[in-house]
């Protein structure tokens, strides 16, 4: 048994050491993600008949009269969005028509989509041109000039800092527990340490050395393990298994997204799986606290809607040649209505809101129309009024919103206690295992930010939120140089889903928005939530175009006609 004096000394040391370590770690992770250069890349030239040439700066390029087109042809015979010019991994090119009025011709023949060969003459709205791709040598030069990802040494230092922080956390909870739950705490924190080092080793083997995105995710997983160790230490093994499954899903999606054509094919399976998960839950799920969103299989219980988020992002992402066709947008709208309809029948309005935000992001990125988004928001307003009329569970949440101190022993019990515990934690927290949130319902999930804030302080809680904000900014910055709209839409939508979850969880805890029961990605206790968060992270990682950074960008082998 550790004397109380020694325990207090260690906890006091940890209260000051932890914020310093976390600030240093996250600054090192944030800097390369938010400051990398966005160099324009030229992959080919369009040679016009008058001798002028237009640079082709993306792998997918819209061609038309609209000012937002990548390749703008300001002629009255050219449609606003006339066609798409696409490059593939093997260096080949295609041109496709996007339901334009004049059509696209190649060597005088009208085409819907056509592979391009040297000396082919492309006719767009009567404007003839030839595509001249860059040479292999120029492509190698482009790869050399691309922003370099951080090196192995840099990321080794980051993971070492994180490991030190994890070790200090584990010791703090072991000492506070007084010999209880030793195995659970050691397995939980030790398992995260092993996983993060093994994943880094795997990256080294495949020559990918940038590891900031994953380091941020492992930091958030560590804070989640802290909350579990404080509230329900026996759940640490379950959460560790979920994290391992999430990492496997992350790598599987990475392999799938590495080949854009393969990703397009898997998208249809993802669509079937996404709606299938919800239908199965609707038929066989069990209702807890007003929402029928749990599927119980023997000793296991899961929320399939968390996995449906990943499928929804996969379905929403689309290549440019299909992006501009109204038929595809209509199909996606119908699919979205089916998803939200299932969630409404399940009374899972928090998750439905997240799906709707994802839909807004995808709809805007697909159409570029603010009017489309405005119409969708108006529809949400009407749907929300109807939902509050027919669902007493949702109405109760809104009745207590902004009135929790008027009913502190009833509907406001959870949030009022959370606010008091957060206030008692202050900037640096009470210390590992010294909080009182363990007696509050869902202290490790719905109101997990209060548990972290009480024991680790407001500083670390805010850094948790900023971690997800940084991932979102990184996704937006990567979009400017994205190789394909598939990656751009996927990354921005996934980052938006993660960010909205954080907003609903954190602000719901402090009664700024209604408490929806939405989880904090990577932090909240819940296997389905953990797996889904890692799945969404794969889309953010895939959008990274820095040199040797992402598993979605192949490494160019010099002097050879193929990529690694």
Give the role of each language-model region.
Residues 55-127:
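Forkhead-associated
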Residues 158-191, 196-346, 496, 506-521, ...:
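Membrane-helix boundary/helix-loop-helix interface segments in multi-pass membrane proteins
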Residues 19, 190-195, 244-246, 454-475:
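Hydrophobic alpha-helical transmembrane segments
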Residues 1-75, 89, 137-146:
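Intrinsically disordered, low-complexity acidic Ser/Thr-rich regulatory segments
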Residues 288, 292-294, 301, 374-464, ...:
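Hydrophobic, glycine- and aromatic-enriched re-entrant/interface helices and adjoining loop segments
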Residues 4, 105-151:
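C-terminal boundary/linker segments immediately following FHA domains
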Residues 326-345, 349-389:
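Hydrophobic alpha-helical segments of polytopic membrane proteins
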Residues 459-502:
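Hydrophobic transmembrane alpha-helices and their immediate junctions
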């Amino acid at each position: 048994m550790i004397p109380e004096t020694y325990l207090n000394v260690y906890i006091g040391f940890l209260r000051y050491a932890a914020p310093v370590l976390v600030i240093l770690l996250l600054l090192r992770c944030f800097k390369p993600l938010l400051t990398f250069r966005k160099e324009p890349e030229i992959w080919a030239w369009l040679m016009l008949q008058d001798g002028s040439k237009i640079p082709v700066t993306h792998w997918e390029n819209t061609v038309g009269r609209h000012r937002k087109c990548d390749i703008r042809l300001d002629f009255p015979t050219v449609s606003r969005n006339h066609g798409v010019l696409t490059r593939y991994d093997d260096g080949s090119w295609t041109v496709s028509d996007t339901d334009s009025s004049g059509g696209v011709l190649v060597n005088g023949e009208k085409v819907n989509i056509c592979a391009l060969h040297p000396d082919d003459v492309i006719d767009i709205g009567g404007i003839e041109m030839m595509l001249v791709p860059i040479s292999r040598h120029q492509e190698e030069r482009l790869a050399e000039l691309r922003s370099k990802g951080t090196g192995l040494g840099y990321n080794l230092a980051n993971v070492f800092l994180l490991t030190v922080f994890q070790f200090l956390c584990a010791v703090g909870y072991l000492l506070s527990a007084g010999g209880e739950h030793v195995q659970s705490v050691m397995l939980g924190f030790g398992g995260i340490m092993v996983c993060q080092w093994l994943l880094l080793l795997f990256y080294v083997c495949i020559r990918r050395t940038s590891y900031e995105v994953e380091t941020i995710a492992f930091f958030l997983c560590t804070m989640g393990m802290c909350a579990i160790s404080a509230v329900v230490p026996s759940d640490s093994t379950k959460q560790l298994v979920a994290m391992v499954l999430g990492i496997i899903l992350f790598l599987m999606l990475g392999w799938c997204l590495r080949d854009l054509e393969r990703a397009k094919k898997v998208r249809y399976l993802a669509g079937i799986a996404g709606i299938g998960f919800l239908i199965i839950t609707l038929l066989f799920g069990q209702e807890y606290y007003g929402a029928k969103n749990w599927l119980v299989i023997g000793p296991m219980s899961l929320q399939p809607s968390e996995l449906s988020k990943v499928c929804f992002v996969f379905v929403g992402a689309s290549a440019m040649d299909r992006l501009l066709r109204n038929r595809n947008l209509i199909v996606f709208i119908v699919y979205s209505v089916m998803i939200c309809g299932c969630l409404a029948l399940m009374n899972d309005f928090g998750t439905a809101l997240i799906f709707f935000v994802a839909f807004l992001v995808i709809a805007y990125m697909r159409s570029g129309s603010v009017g489309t988004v405005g119409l969708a928001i108006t529809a949400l307003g009407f749907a929300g009024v109807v939902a509050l009329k027919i669902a007493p569970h949702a109405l109760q949440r809104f009745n207590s919103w902004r009135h929790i101190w008027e009913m502190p022993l009833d509907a406001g019990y959870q949030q009022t206690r959370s606010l008091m515990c957060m206030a008692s934690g202050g900037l640096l927290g009470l210390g590992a295992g010294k909080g009182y949130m363990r007696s509050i319902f869902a202290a490790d999930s719905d109101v997990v930010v209060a548990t972290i804030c009480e024991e680790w302080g407001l500083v670390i809680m805010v850094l948790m939120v900023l971690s997800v904000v940084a991932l979102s900014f990184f996704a937006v910055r990567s979009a400017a140089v994205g190789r394909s709209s598939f990656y751009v839409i996927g990354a921005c939508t996934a980052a938006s889903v993660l960010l909205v979850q954080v907003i609903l969880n954190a602000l719901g805890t402090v009664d700024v928005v209604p408490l929806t029961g939405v989880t904090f990605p990577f932090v909240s206790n819940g296997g389905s939530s953990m797996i889904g968060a890692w799945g969404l992270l794969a889309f953010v990682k895939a959008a990274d175009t820095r040199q040797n950074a992402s598993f979605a960008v192949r490494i160019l082998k010099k002097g050879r006609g193929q990529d690694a």
